[in-house]
């Protein structure tokens, strides 16, 4: 189905990522942005309500007919699950309790992780910090696809399969690109998560567990919100490494669409990123942007010039400070 993508390698660049320099320039001109670098304590209540909502949903779906279970799993469960992964993204930046209470944030991330079904929050934090420090870094940034992904998923049909299988690739990619020794916190995350899964299964049954696990997988695969995976850093326009999205799904995703703003100011919680854009509008308005994640997914699949190889990549030099 369709032609193969034209790219046969990543877009190798020999310059540093643009975010550090732009951050310095904006802060020199607008030092008031520093006042936005503070915890968002509303995250605590929002995430707690999301966990409670999923617990109620587990109970409500436990006796549903399978066709209705599948319907509600995709329509409701997948949306909440994907939204929760982006809440965990916020928590990984210590946005819930602040940098002075890092362990509180790690524990809260494990709590937010519970309705996802698979241990995720602690490992995500470790790799995500590398992504910010070394964006596009060869052998470090696991957000960059492997060479196999770029080589194999090169036709529209294969790219569609690749999007559906995003949860799988985000799971195995770190093991191929930048494996890290497992930590005590990751073991705790795993034990807590699987204990919770067992509790759900024994108290509410297999359908509740299905809703939890399959909802997470579907939400991170072929789903409108999953457009952000492609929109954030895939090079739709040559020379542009990061892109923002300013559409309505930001309300469900803690403003993850404000991605240029986020990489420029990772200490600013999602709720304040629109203020960053407003204050420094002359820096962000000229940058390429999206208004539809669904269109991003469609264009990525159908455009023969785009593939998993459509990422800017750089060799890293000097001593690396890895998580």
Swiss-Prot record:
Keywords in alphabetical order: Endoplasmic reticulum, Fatty acid biosynthesis, Fatty acid metabolism, Isomerase, Lipid biosynthesis, Lipid metabolism, Membrane, Oxidoreductase, Transmembrane, Transmembrane helix
Organism: Xenopus tropicalis
Annotated gene: degs1
Protein name as annotated: Sphingolipid delta(4)-desaturase DES1
Subunit structure of this chain's protein: Interacts with RLBP1; the interaction increases synthesis of chromophore-precursors by DEGS1.
Topology versus the membrane: Multi-pass membrane protein
EC number: 1.14.19.17, 5.2.1.-
Keyword Ribonucleoprotein applies: no
Location of the protein in the cell: Endoplasmic reticulum membrane
Entry function: Has sphingolipid-delta-4-desaturase activity. Converts D-erythro-sphinganine to D-erythro-sphingosine (E-sphing-4-enine). Catalyzes the equilibrium isomerization of retinols.
Source organism superkingdom: Eukaryota
Reaction catalysis annotation: an N-acylsphinganine + 2 Fe(II)-[cytochrome b5] + O2 + 2 H(+) = an N-acylsphing-4-enine + 2 Fe(III)-[cytochrome b5] + 2 H2O; all-trans-retinol = 11-cis-retinol; all-trans-retinol = 9-cis-retinol; all-trans-retinol = 13-cis-retinol
Transmembrane segments: 41-61, 68-88, 104-124, 152-172, 185-205, 210-230
InterPro entries cross-referenced by the UniProt entry: DES1/DES2 (IPR011388), FA_desaturase_dom (IPR005804), Sphingolipid_d4-desaturase_N (IPR013866)
């Amino acid at each position: 189905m369709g032609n193969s993508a034209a790219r046969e390698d990543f877009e190798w660049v020999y310059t540093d990522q643009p975010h550090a320099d732009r951050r310095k320039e904006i802060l020199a001109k607008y030092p008031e942005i520093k006042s936005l670098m503070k915890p968002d304590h509303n995250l605590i209540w929002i995430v707690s309500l999301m966990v409670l909502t999923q617990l109620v949903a587990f109970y409500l779906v436990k006796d549903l007919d399978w066709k209705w279970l599948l319907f509600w799993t995709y329509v409701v469960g997948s949306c909440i699950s994907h939204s929760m992964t982006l809440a965990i993204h916020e928590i990984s930046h210590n946005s819930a309790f602040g940098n002075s209470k890092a362990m509180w944030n790690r524990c809260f991330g494990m709590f937010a992780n519970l309705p996802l079904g698979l241990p995720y929050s602690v490992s995500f934090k470790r790799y995500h910090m590398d992504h910010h420090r070394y964006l596009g870094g060869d052998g470090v940034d696991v957000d960059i696809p492997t060479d196999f992904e770029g080589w194999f998923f090169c036709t529209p049909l294969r790219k569609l399969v690749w999007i559906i299988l995003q949860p799988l690739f985000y799971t195995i990619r770190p093991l191929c690109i930048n494996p890290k020794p497992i930590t005590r916190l990751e073991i705790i995350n795993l034990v807590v998560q699987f204990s919770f899964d067992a509790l759900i299964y024994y108290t509410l049954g297999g359908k509740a567990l299905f809703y939890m696990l399959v909802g997470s997988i579907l939400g991170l695969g072929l789903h409108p919100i999953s457009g952000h995976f492609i929109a954030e850093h895939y090079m739709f326009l040559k020379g542009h490494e990061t892109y923002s999205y300013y559409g309505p799904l930001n309300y469900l995703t803690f403003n993850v669409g404000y991605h240029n703003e986020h990489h420029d100011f990772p200490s600013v919680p999602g709720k304040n990123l629109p203020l960053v854009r407003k204050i420094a509008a002359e820096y962000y308005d000229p940058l390429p942007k999206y208004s539809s994640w669904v269109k991003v997914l469609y264009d990525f699949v159908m455009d023969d010039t785009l593939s998993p190889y459509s990422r800017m990549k750089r060799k890293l030099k000097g001593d690396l400070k890895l998580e």
